[in-house]
Structure formats: structure tokens, C-alpha cells
From Swiss-Prot:
Family: Belongs to the UPF0161 family.
Organism the protein comes from: Clostridium botulinum (strain Langeland / NCTC 10281 / Type F)
Main localization category: membrane
Chain's role: Could be involved in insertion of integral membrane proteins into the membrane.
Protein's UniProt name: Putative membrane protein insertion efficiency factor
Pfam family for this entry, one: YidD
High-level lineage: Bacteria, Bacillati, Bacillota, Clostridia, Eubacteriales
């Protein structure tokens, strides 16, 4: 499952992300953060952490440096 999620994120980064303008308010980007979270915590917990981060990525949040802890 972990490898499937990583593959999906990498496909998103290669094929979908270039079609959109850069909009992530954080560093590392949300997709990189998701990869790191899934690698560190596994499929389930990493996905939940990633969803929480993606929900924070909006114009009303200041953003900034937010590494996987």
C-alpha cells in the first residue's frame, strides 16, 4: 500500500502538477511532505498526516516552513 501511494504522488508530480501554477504555501511542498510522511510513518498514519497538511494549504494560512516531524 505504501508503495502504491508513493507511486500515485510521483505520478501527480510528474503529470498533473506541471499543468497548474505553483500554489503551495509551505516548504516542503505538500506533495513532498506527503512523500516524507508516508515514508516515515507508513501508509495509514502518513496519509492522515498528509491530509491534515493539505487542508491547511489555503490562502488564509500563512504557510512557511513545516517539515514532517
Amino acid at each position: 500500500m505504501k508503495n502504491l501511494l508513493i507511486c500515485i504522488i510521483k505520478m501527480y508530480r510528474k503529470y498533473i502538477s506541471p499543468l497548474k501554477r505553483p500554489s503551495c504555501r509551505f516548504y516542503p511542498t505538500c506533495s513532498q511532505y506527503s512523500l516524507e510522511a508516508i515514508e516515515k510513518y507508513g501508509a495509514l498514519k502518513g496519509t492522515l498526516i498528509s491530509i491534515k497538511r493539505i487542508l491547511k494549504c489555503h490562502p488564509f494560512n500563512e504557510g512557511g516552513y513545516d517539515p514532517v516531524k
